[in-house]
Amino acid sequence: MGQKVNPHGLRVGVIKDWDSKWYAEGDFADYLVEDYNIRTFLKKKLYAAGVSKIEIERASDRVKVIIYTAKPGVVIGKGGAEIEKIKAEVQKLTDKKLVVDIKEVKRPDKDAQLVAENIALQLENRVSFRRAMKSCMGRAMKAGVKGIKTTCSGRLGGADMARTETYNDGTTPLQTIRADIDYGFAEADTTYGKVGVKVWIYKGEVLPTKANKEGGAK
């Protein structure tokens, strides 16, 4: 059943960390909707900047938003003008003090979300789906990943009947919990309709740390 579950969600608390880090009792639903609105807005606004993921941390009086991007210059803008505009717009979505931090994704070819968005962009530009998938997979393998699997679903090449095509390179052990699997999903808006793109990237094994009796880590 490894293909049917989000690999990140399966590994959260074992080798992966949460994207939202906060605790709430009565306000849980409000915070959840607020997080969703912040992420949706930033993803749409900064799509050209190649945003890999957005982490949100909350304290009693402030919200910290960490944006992981392949192009930090696009997010920050000339003299920090763009980031100030973004801060002002995101501030409207929350009533707490907002802190925005930008972190660069050094190797975008090894990031599953960015690879999926790259394939989707090529499909929108009428590149053959096979060429788009295989070129991105080749770059990822050259970047040093252990394995990559890509799937495209929809009216591929303008066919009358929708279908799914999958390509693999290397190994992607989806059922091994200690395997560091990065997963990304994107949609391409083509003239024939939407095409879904999924990418799994295997980066190697990570051994989970167990807390010992003294409270340290083994």
UniProtKB/Swiss-Prot annotation:
The keyword Ribonucleoprotein is assigned to this record: yes
Gene3D superfamilies: 3.30.300.20, Ribosomal protein S3, C-terminal domain
Calcium among keywords: no
UniProt domain KH type-2: residue ranges: 38-106
InterPro entries, per the entry: KH_dom (IPR004087), KH_dom-like_a/b (IPR015946), KH_dom_type_2 (IPR004044), KH_sf_prok-type (IPR009019), Ribosomal_S3_C_sf (IPR036419), Ribosomal_uS3_bac-typ (IPR005704), Ribosomal_uS3_C (IPR001351), Ribosomal_uS3_CS (IPR018280)
Family membership: Belongs to the universal ribosomal protein uS3 family.
Name of the protein this chain belongs to: Small ribosomal subunit protein uS3
Species: Agathobacter rectalis (strain ATCC 33656 / DSM 3377 / JCM 17463 / KCTC 5835 / VPI 0990) (Eubacterium rectale)
